[in-house]
From Swiss-Prot:
The gene is TLP1. This is Protein TWIN LOV 1. The lineage of its organism: Eukaryota, Viridiplantae, Streptophyta, Embryophyta, Tracheophyta. Disulfide bonds: none annotated. CDD domains: PAS. It comes from Arabidopsis thaliana. Residues 98-153, 320-376 form the PAC domain.
Length: 399
């Protein structure tokens, strides 16, 4: 299995790792690397929900280098025999922002499959209750004890005396099954007799306890180093009154939209930005933590037309859409300004109340460029539609 970076990725590996260490301190990675566990940490606020940290134990277990893992989604370790039901359990847990523990068949870089106990939990920001990361611990399932038990129970099902990895489903009985660094030959009879009694590999109680202890150790490190940075995290959600909480499922859905846009909450004081797309960060030169919580006027400068700002304010107060051309300022090295073709539109909830405003930006220089697919105005309306669908279909977390 060879991993390659997607050409659509906005973030470099360094930027993806910075998005993680920015909440803590520069020493967080060194502290995490001292832990003996196999685990990864992902960031749902980055498009594609990529891995932003991988432990040395995880890299050794899978055979990949850190450069091959950082920036990738965890699904790249799955394969043709990975149980789809287990994957749906994990996705559902992410959507509901809760912990989950399942047995999972993953694949090493060499292509060999292995069973593991997958234990994932969310990490919440203590100030706003939003999910900041997901921690996933992977404990290899040995299966020895279960193997012996199964052999005794199903010994009369087949005359074949070759060793069978009884704790695993037939769907993975091919080639060599690697267990605890030892290759065990696995042979399966084509006869289906008795196979319905075979179960998916189940972790022992000690392996489940090991996963729980590992999660607690990782969380302890994250909490400690977040205290040093002043941006506290915790393993439980603490929502402050008046602070908007976007579910991670909504954040992931919004991350699939590749255009430049921001989402603001008109119900909060000063209508702050609560989501900024990767393309917006590229256009303006700002980092995500510099944008969230700001009012959109932070992009304005000395030469920004105040009458345009007033027009935008009036439309927002009336709950109406508007399209303007406004001079904005970037955070690039040259602090350059750019003409922004900005479309603002309300996003309503199921009851018809305005829940958010979406602002879609197109650099005006692109307006005169021949675009084969869609005109800028059409692209903006497409983004608005995609945001509305994401908001209405995602599970919203209410504080």
């Amino acid at each position: 299995m060879s991993l390659t970076k997607s050409s659509e990725s906005v973030f470099t590996e360094e930027e993806e790792e910075d998005s993680f260490s920015g909440r803590y301190t520069l020493w967080i990675k060194e502290a995490l690397e001292e832990l003996p566990h196999n685990f990864t940490i992902t960031d749902p606020f980055i498009s594609g929900h990529p891995i932003v940290f991988a432990s040395l134990g995880f890299l050794k277990m899978t055979g990949y280098s850190r450069e091959e893992v950082i920036g990738r989604n965890g699904k790249v370790f799955q394969g043709p025999k990975t149980n789809r039901r287990s994957i749906m359990e994990i996705r559902e847990a992410i959507r509901e922002e809760r912990s989950v523990q399942v047995s999972l068949l993953n694949y090493r870089k060499s292509g060999s499959p292995f069973w593991m106990l997958f234990h994932m939990c969310p990490v919440f920001g203590k100030d706003d209750g939003k999910v900041t990361n997901f921690v996933a611990v992977q404990v290899p399932i040995s299966g020895r004890e279960h193997h012996r038990k199964k052999l005794r129970n199903v010994g009369d099902l087949s005359s074949d005396t070759s060793p069978t990895f009884g704790s695993c489903r037939r769907e993975v009985c091919f080639g060599n099954f690697v267990c605890q660094d030892r290759a065990l030959p696995v042979e399966c009879d084509d006869d289906e007799q008795g196979l319905e009694d075979w179960e998916q590999c189940e972790a022992s109680e000690s392996e489940k306890l090991k996963a729980t202890e590992a999660i607690n150790n990782v969380l302890s490190i994250l909490v400690h180093y977040s205290e040093l940075s002043g941006r506290l995290v915790c393993g439980k959600r603490y929502c402050l009154r008046g602070v908007d909480c976007l579910s991670s499922s909504l954040v992931i859905s919004l991350g699939r939209i590749k255009q430049s846009f921001v989402l603001t909450n008109p119900c909060l004081p000063d209508m702050p930005i609560i989501y900024a797309s990767d393309a917006f960060l590229t256009l303006t030169g700002y980092k995500r933590q510099e944008v969230l919580g700001q009012n959109c006027r932070f992009l304005s400068g000395v030469d920004t037309d105040s009458s345009v700002l007033y027009e935008m304010k009036e439309c927002i107060l009336k709950g109406q859409s508007c399209t303007v051309q406004i001079l904005n300022y970037s955070n690039r090295k040259d602090k350059s300004s750019f003409w922004n073709l900005l479309h603002i539109s309300p996003v309503r909830n199921a009851s018809g109340k305005t829940a958010y405003f979406v602002g879609v930006q197109v650099e005006a220089s692109c307006r005169n460029t021949e675009i084969k697919e869609l005109r800028p105005e059409t692209r903006q309306l497409s983004v608005v539609g995609a945001v509305r669908v994401a908001v209405r279909s995602s599970l919203m977390v209410t504080c």
